[in-house]
């Protein structure tokens, strides 16, 4: 069975729109870009569309590699800006940690600044990373996480690690296993899990024989194969498990949450 993520994304967006109307001013998101990566550019395009729909002002700043850190720092003191997003991936020569540390913490709507990520260790979530939060929101709609055996495949700073911490959070109380490319007997681990989240970046990586019947599977993957978007989960898994689709799954909820965070940042800054 496919999990209906569209409805989840729409309901987040509806609440965001209502909150924008109550704010009394137009909140603003600025996306800083120093990339010609096609998927990053297409994400910026979809941000523009979504911002228009939600009544949020949106600007893209195209900057040179030398300008990126200073631009981010300046945006911190610009009172007309409520949220700051940085387009990734960065070219290999970039110091990712330095750049992300320069995203103003209180405007870090994507939750990428190490200061925001660090709060997850304390079970605090001011701006959790949007994709990890999307996975959690979807899971909480589908099940009670307490005591569930969850396997997260992928240990990136963007998705896998923060997600594992968020699932472990007191109150959510999942039992979490994190797997990666050196994991031995991955199939045995995923097959014994109530929930599997796949954030690997390989098309159709998780096969039906790796999943327990009745499990919930969250597909984070974005892979372009012959120009077609495919997830990390083989479509046949849907025959035995509840699976988020790609496209139309985690990605939609992720974008909806980014804008929810912009409004939350604006509400805080107004106070
Ligand atoms: P990374 O490349 O940073 O991480 C991939 C992870 O997968 C690594 O931890 C790697 O292990 C692990 N891995 C690779 N091969 C295997 C294997 N054979 N068995 C088990 N684990 C393996 O990717 P991201 O986390 O940034 O992204 C993952 C996917 O999610 C990508 O397709 C990306 O495009 C997508 N994505 C989607 C988003 C959305 O909103 N829907 C947002 C962000 C990402 P190791 O650490 O050992 O190398």
From Swiss-Prot:
Transmembrane segments: none
EC number from the UniProt entry: 1.5.1.5, 3.5.4.9
Binding residues annotated for NADP(+), in chain numbering: 154-156, 181, 222
Keywords: Amino-acid biosynthesis, Histidine biosynthesis, Hydrolase, Methionine biosynthesis, Multifunctional enzyme, NADP, One-carbon metabolism, Oxidoreductase, Purine biosynthesis
Keyword Zinc assigned: no
Superkingdom classification of source: Bacteria
Gene3D superfamilies for this protein: Leucine Dehydrogenase, chain A, domain 1, NAD(P)-binding Rossmann-like Domain
Keyword DNA-binding carried by entry: no
Pathway noted in the entry: One-carbon metabolism; tetrahydrofolate interconversion
Single Gene Ontology MF annotation: methylenetetrahydrofolate dehydrogenase (NADP+) activity
Reactions the enzyme catalyzes: (6R)-5,10-methylene-5,6,7,8-tetrahydrofolate + NADP(+) = (6R)-5,10-methenyltetrahydrofolate + NADPH; (6R)-5,10-methenyltetrahydrofolate + H2O = (6R)-10-formyltetrahydrofolate + H(+)
Cysteine-cysteine disulfides: none
Pfam families attached to this UniProt entry: THF_DHG_CYH, THF_DHG_CYH_C
Recorded GO CC terms: cytosol
GO BP annotation list: L-histidine biosynthetic process; methionine biosynthetic process; purine nucleotide biosynthetic process; tetrahydrofolate interconversion
Entry function: Catalyzes the oxidation of 5,10-methylenetetrahydrofolate to 5,10-methenyltetrahydrofolate and then the hydrolysis of 5,10-methenyltetrahydrofolate to 10-formyltetrahydrofolate.
Subunit structure: Homodimer.
Family (UniProt): Belongs to the tetrahydrofolate dehydrogenase/cyclohydrolase family.
Annotated protein name in UniProt: Bifunctional protein FolD
Organism: Thermotoga sp. (strain RQ2)
